UniProtKB/Swiss-Prot annotation:
Family designation: Belongs to the NfuA family.
Species this chain originates from: Erwinia tasmaniensis (strain DSM 17950 / CFBP 7177 / CIP 109463 / NCPPB 4357 / Et1/99)
Cofactor note: Binds 1 [4Fe-4S] cluster per subunit. The cluster is presumably bound at the interface of two monomers.
HAMAP family cross-referenced by the UniProt entry: Fe_S_biogen_NfuA
GO molecular function ontology, one term from the record: 4 iron, 4 sulfur cluster binding
Stated name of the protein: Fe/S biogenesis protein NfuA
Subunit description: Homodimer.
Length: 191
């Protein structure tokens, strides 16, 4: 469910050594399955463990996950990264905003999941996003760009070289992608 790297375990072990005996960590998602989902880590003293919690045992600690957050923390990774600028704890949870769909789910659900879990987080760094409008009977995914992607001069490259390649690799049953957006260049446009 959750991978906690060795460096993150060391970091947590140091922090936990200064807490009440038996205190572990809790990993959770606030507003799971929504666009405003946020992940967090907190201390979990022994008296805060609920009967419905899942305990994940690691070499140096245990992480507790509440029943509601668990499906949204599938494939999550916690790491402690040190570089020239300092140290930072990172928590990546690709399923926090949308629950992972099964491989045999309808094509439209699998495409929507790929957009929300992999493509939109990349576009978000430019203030952009893409939405699935439909999948045609001919097998084309019809997309609409928003935010910084709307009116961006690089949108064709993003569509053909990025999104389409990724989607065709993941879904061979698709024939391609089409952009439905009426692009309006403005201050909101990234390029």
């Amino acid at each position: 469910m959750i991978l906690i790297t060795d460096s993150a375990q060391e970091h947590f072990a140091k922090l936990l050594s200064k807490q009440e005996d038996g205190t572990q960590i809790r990993v959770f998602v606030i507003n799971p399955g929504t666009p405003t989902a946020e992940c967090g880590v907190s201390y979990c003293p022994p008296d805060a463990v609920e009967a419905t919690d899942t305990e994940l045992k690691f070499d140096k600690l245990s992480a507790f996950v509440d029943e509601l957050s668990a499906p949204y923390l599938q494939d999550a990774e916690i790491d402690f990264v040190t570089d020239n600028l300092g140290s930072q704890l990172t928590l990546k949870a690709p399923n926090a905003k949308m629950r992972k769909v099964s491989d045999d789910a309808p094509l439209i659900e699998r495409v929507e999941y790929l957009l929300q879990a992999q493509i939109n987080p990349q576009l978000a760094s430019h203030g952009g996003k893409v939405s699935l409008m439909e999948i045609t009977d001919e097998g084309y995914a019809i997309l609409q760009f928003g935010g910084g992607c709307n009116g961006c001069s690089m949108v064709d490259v993003t569509l053909k070289e990025g999104i389409e390649k990724e989607m065709l690799a993941a879904f061979p049953e698709l024939k391609g992608v089409r952009d439905l957006t009426e692009h309006q260049r403005g201050e909101h446009s990234f390029y």
